[in-house]
C-alpha cells in the first residue's frame, strides 16, 4: 500500500507541470519588441454602389442631425487611393506564451449622429466596452457575441454609459453590434488577448509595431469580404511590408 502511494505521488510530480495553462505564460519584456509589420489593404475592382440611407423613414431626429441629407452606408468604403477602409488586421498566431500588460481605460463605442463610432475597432480581452449615447434620440445596443455573452440594452437620450466586460477572445470573426431601432447602425468589435491589431483608415494602411522576431500569421477581416491570411517571418530590428487585396464580390 505504501509503494502504491509513493508511485501515485511520483506521477503527480511528473505530470502536473505539463498541464499548466495561462500560469505558464511569461510576462512580456518590451525590450524584445524590435520588429514591425506594416502594410495596406487594396480593393480590386469597381467600387460597389451603396444605396443612400433614408434616416427620416426611421427617425426624424436622426435625419435632422445631418440636415436631412441622406447618408452613405459604411459597409464598403473604398478610399480615393483604391484601398479599403474599416478592415481589422491582427496577429492571429505567433505570440502565444506571452502575458502582455493591459492598457489603461476601456474601449469606447459612441452612438453619435445615429452612427456607431468607430465602425470597427479592436480591444483587449478583459477590458470593458463602454457604450455611450451622444444623440438626442433613443438607441439600443445589441451585441451578437458568439464567444462573449450576447447583450441587448436600451439607451434613451441622455442615458448613462453602459460598460460591458469582454472576458473572452473573439476576433475571428469580430462581434457584431447593432441598433434594432435604426437598422443601418452596426459596428464590429474584435476582442484580442494581445496588443497586435489595427484597423485601416482613410489610406488603407496598417502598422503592427513592437513585435518580437518570429513567424506570424497575419489575418485581415472585412465585414463583406471576409478574411485573408498571410504568413511572414521577421527578424530583429526588421520592418516588413505586406499587401492584401480584396476582390469584389456580387
Task: Indicate residue ranges for each PLM-predicted region.
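Bacterial N-terminal signal peptides
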Residues: 8-15
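Extracytoplasmic copper-binding redox domains, predominantly the cupredoxin/blue-copper superfamily
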Residues: 21-250
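Bacterial N-terminal signal peptides that target proteins for export
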Residues: 1-7
Amino acid at each position: 500500500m505504501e509503494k502504491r502511494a509513493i508511485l501515485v505521488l511520483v506521477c503527480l510530480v511528473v505530470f502536473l507541470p505539463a498541464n499548466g495553462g495561462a500560469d505558464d505564460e511569461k510576462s512580456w519584456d518590451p525590450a524584445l519588441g524590435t520588429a514591425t509589420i506594416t502594410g495596406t489593404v487594396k480593393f480590386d475592382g469597381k467600387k460597389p454602389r451603396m444605396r443612400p440611407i433614408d434616416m427620416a423613414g426611421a427617425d426624424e431626429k436622426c435625419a435632422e442631425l445631418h440636415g436631412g441629407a441622406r447618408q452613405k452606408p459604411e459597409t464598403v468604403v473604398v478610399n480615393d487611393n483604391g484601398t479599403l477602409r474599416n478592415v481589422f488586421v491582427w496577429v492571429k498566431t505567433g505570440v502565444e506564451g506571452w502575458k502582455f500588460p493591459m492598457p489603461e481605460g476601456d474601449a469606447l463605442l459612441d452612438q453619435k449622429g445615429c452612427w456607431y463610432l468607430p465602425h470597427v475597432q479592436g480591444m483587449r480581452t478583459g477590458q470593458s466596452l463602454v457604450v455611450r449615447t451622444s444623440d438626442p434620440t433613443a438607441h439600443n445596443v445589441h451585441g451578437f457575441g458568439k464567444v462573449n455573452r450576447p447583450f441587448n440594452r436600451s439607451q434613451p437620450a441622455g442615458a448613462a454609459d453602459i460598460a460591458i466586460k469582454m472576458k473572452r477572445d473573439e476576433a475571428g470573426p469580430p462581434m457584431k453590434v447593432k441598433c434594432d431601432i435604426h437598422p443601418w447602425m452596426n459596428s464590429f468589435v474584435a476582442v484580442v488577448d494581445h496588443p497586435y491589431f489595427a484597423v485601416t483608415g482613410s489610406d488603407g494602411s496598417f502598422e503592427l509595431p513592437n513585435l518580437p522576431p518570429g513567424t506570424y500569421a497575419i489575418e485581415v477581416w472585412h465585414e463583406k469580404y471576409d478574411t485573408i491570411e498571410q504568413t511572414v517571418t521577421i527578424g530583429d530590428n526588421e520592418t516588413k511590408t505586406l499587401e492584401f487585396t480584396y476582390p469584389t464580390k456580387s
